[in-house]
Amino acid sequence: ASAARGTGVPVIADGGLRYSGDIVKALAAGGDCVMIGSMFAGTEEAPGETIIYNGRKFKSYRGMGSLDAMKAGSADRYFQKGDVNINKLVPEGIVARVPFKGMLSETVFQLVGGIRAGMGYCGAPNIETLKETGKFVKISAASLKESHPHDIHITKEAPNYSVE
């Protein structure tokens, strides 16, 4: 991000963002915006078929770099538009199913709350301050594990947390 500073070229964080904390980290690292389409997958408003599987509700999800999406027209985003031979396309995404999340507004509400909390942890009232004063601290795998719920069985799912 520092290489782009002052050039007028925005830095876009794209890929690997799963939680609101990841958005805060991307912005603190100098990102100007984030790509969070996969975070919206599974919402009522997201494209995709609603599926019942093993008694639970899911939505189909097609990453823009998936072979299916490329066949449907996104290949030009990956500079492969001229490759009409489907065997020559090089996919960067997948087709899958994701748990149904409810309304988009609920997901956005949770994300905004998480971003505000993350900025609060950093003492940053706005994104510019976050970029200027945000600090990264390396922690061990054991510390990461300890920072999440452990030695329990979750009995009620939270809208902003999932066990992976």
Question: How should each PLM-predicted stretch be described?
Answer:
Residues A1-A13, L17-E164:
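Alpha/beta catalytic cores of nucleotide-metabolism and tRNA/nucleoside-modifying enzymes
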